Amino acid sequence: MDVIRTAIGLMSGTSMDGIDVALIRTDGRGFIERGPFMGVPYDADFRGQLKRALELSRPLTDRSERPAELREIELELTLRHAIAVTAFMERFGLAADAVDVLGFHGQTVLHRPDEGLTIQIGDGGELAKRTAISVVYDMRANDMVHGGQGAPLVPAYHAALAGKFQQAGQAVCFVNIGGISNLTFIGTDGRISAFDSGPGNTLIDQWVEMQTGRTYDPGGEIGGRGKVVASLAERYLQSPFFRGNVRRSLDRGDFAPLQSEEASLEDGARTLAHVAAASIIKSGGFLPETPALYIVCGGGRLNATLMAEFSVMAERLGSRVLTAEEAGFDGDAMEAEAWAYLAVRSLDGLPLTFPGTTGVGAPVTGGVLATP
């Protein structure tokens, strides 16, 4: 009988807005019992430190390199994760010995799949010591060692969640609109395909922050007052990324931000929401079949302008669009839940990535285990 474990997943994504903390009970296979979720936002000063970490990481050629300033940021990130875990457990009445493992993503500061290089800062050993809970971390690297792109990793969890829709004979596509958007397609035959689909919130967030000092477009309100600037949209949508037959994982630096003089605040936000939606549809053209259903998670599902654009485009192809909540899930918690699920799979030596998800030659496990 497969062992059911209690796991907490910790996710700090490319949007760099905070830590998502989620608990599940799972056997790392088909059994999933979803528990509580909590978000812990970063303050502006620490978001600035993470942006500095991106700059410090550019010249690195080894995933273990930590120049002194980057190491300081890594330790601060780890401390904030430890504090988040402690706050989560106090809030929901959990003791350390009630949790079997933490799945710790860390913060991606460099991702160059063509060079076989990915760097996530975050000290798993230090986190295990501070929380008194075993930690699985650095889950992307082994995939890249074996020729994969190192992303996306969440598809294994999406496939486990998709069971009820497959029973209805539907091809389902999960869309995670984070800083970068990615797709997980589960066909009617159960086959999984997954890849990054293009820019998600990153370009919108960068634009709004540059123009207003706010870190995002709340509810898509700013974009909702603008119009699409076709020439700017086409500049993004004509990227070689959308033309090649080989899918690859993306870094937040793969698409250059708009320049301040290129559009009004509202038109820029609307154009970039259109680009985010159209990117999903364009990349969806590489799927084995058109999904009957798109399930949207990640922060982008809260941008009404982006969602309206995407829904119209999908409906033209005969597809239905639901938010994660409309499908019975929690769109805020899903990535953190996935990291908890992957940690349990790692403990059991089960594959985290597959040829259809990262391009790795054969299914491989991953992750490094740190004990208290």
From Swiss-Prot:
Alphabetical GO biological process terms: 1,6-anhydro-N-acetyl-beta-muramic acid catabolic process; amino sugar metabolic process; peptidoglycan turnover
Pathway where this protein functions: Amino-sugar metabolism; 1,6-anhydro-N-acetylmuramate degradation; Cell wall biogenesis; peptidoglycan recycling
Top-level EC class: transferase
GO MF annotation, one: ATP binding
Alphabetical list of Gene3D superfamilies matching this protein: 3.30.420.40
A Pfam family this chain is assigned to: AnmK
InterPro entries, A to Z: Anhydro_N_Ac-Mur_kinase, ATPase_NBD
Record carries keyword Transferase: yes
Primary role: Catalyzes the specific phosphorylation of 1,6-anhydro-N-acetylmuramic acid (anhMurNAc) with the simultaneous cleavage of the 1,6-anhydro ring, generating MurNAc-6-P. Is required for the utilization of anhMurNAc either imported from the medium or derived from its own cell wall murein, and thus plays a role in cell wall recycling.
Family of the protein in this entry: Belongs to the anhydro-N-acetylmuramic acid kinase family.
Xref: NCBIfam families: PRK09585.1-5
Protein name in the entry: Anhydro-N-acetylmuramic acid kinase
